[in-house]
Amino acid sequence: MVLQQYGIIAVFLVGGAATAVAALATNWLLRPKKPPEGDKLAAYECGLKTQGPTWIQFKVSYFLYALVFLLFDVETVFLYPWAVRFQALGLFAFAEMIVFIGILVLGLWYAWKEGALKWL
């Protein structure tokens, strides 16, 4: 019985690896044979010649918000099973979850205090 369950997992792992290898092999077979040159490597701005430098540096702050979102999204993954089994788990699990949420709120407060969540 246990071997059959591991067999299913092995089939999925082999299938996933085969799909990835097939995608990479197809990409390699269909790629252009000669490297691009000339206008293909030039920056494109609506069909016109570029005006000014094409590579400008700008600050992207989305990753900070994405990181905070990911943190609290993972928190909900841990909170949901606990909430479903709340009555069966008892007071000790409630105290553990309060500590878990407290640590996350403390981290959010620290990031906010340090200015990590400022847009610009």
Curated annotation (Swiss-Prot):
Q: Where are the transmembrane segments?
A: 6-26, 63-83, 89-109
Q: Which InterPro entries match?
A: NAD(P)H_OxRDtase_bac/plastid (IPR023043), NADH_UbQ/plastoQ_OxRdtase_su3 (IPR000440), NDAH_ubi_oxred_su3_sf (IPR038430)
Task: Give the record's GO CC terms.
Answer: NADH dehydrogenase complex; plasma membrane
Keywords, alphabetical? Cell membrane, Membrane, NAD, Quinone, Translocase, Transmembrane, Transmembrane helix, Transport
GO terms of molecular function: NADH dehydrogenase (ubiquinone) activity; NADH:ubiquinone reductase (non-electrogenic) activity; quinone binding
What Pfam family does this protein match (any one)? Oxidored_q4
According to its UniProt record, which protein family does this protein belong to?
Answer: Belongs to the complex I subunit 3 family.
Protein name (database record): NADH-quinone oxidoreductase subunit A
Q: Which organism is it from?
A: Moorella thermoacetica (strain ATCC 39073 / JCM 9320)
